[in-house]
Amino acid sequence: MVSDFLADPDTWAQPLRRLSTRHTTIAVEVIDPRELSLSDVGLLTVVDPASGRTREVPTASRKLRARYEEAAAEQRAATAAAITAAGADHLVLRTDRDWLMDVVRFVVDRRARVHARRAGMGAR
């Protein structure tokens, strides 16, 4: 499953859990680092696509930018916890990095975990 997982985990965690009980599942989270922090660009007008409402956001505020980063970190932690609880493996790909190397690293690490798990089962 490939997603940015920005929606509330309540909307996708249960279907992911059901999928993971029947299949080997890898949740691939695509992250744009520009969404993890808020740049100081002055007064920013944002529009809610659902309601059409607009809001002015004073991005010069250090306090606001710090709260934004904190909320983004909390959202990422909640996403990781929900994916783990659903029984899926979690691969994070960032748009500012070489995603191919991240995939290779993930496959090597995953293969080692599976091998270790199987070796542990054989020792019983």
Where are these regions (language model features)?
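Acidic beta-strand-to-loop metal/phosphate-binding motif
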Residues: M1-D4
